[in-house]
Amino acid sequence: VHGHAALFGVYGILGIGLILFVLRGLYPDRHWNGKLLAWAFWLINIGLLVMLVGSLLPVVIFQAIEAIQNGYWSARSEAFMQSEHMQIIRWLRIPGDLLLAFGELLLVYFIIGLQTGWSLKEKR
């Protein structure tokens, strides 16, 4: 859980921020229409939270219980990872992944809109 959150939180969000910072410099005389960007921001962050809490955290908890009861080798075994309850938890990751993906698609749509003009509004 910590690795997924830290990797995306630090490098993914930092990369998105850097892209937006550079794009802001390309259009210094105009303001962005931030509604689409706000939706992208919230969908990406809520999707990451749902993915972590709804899927990755339960996997870690079940693996910890299995490791305490039967050893680390058992918690990392194919039999444990392919068990029915782990399959269900793996499918529970889909809602968070979809939110994250929709947020990223909105971000791409916003960036395309910067080039075509629909994501910009004239400076007042």
Give the residues covered by each predicted segment.
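Aromatic-anchored segments of alpha-helical transmembrane domains
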Residues: 47-53
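Hydrophobic alpha-helical transmembrane segments of polytopic
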Residues: 10, 37-47, 93-103
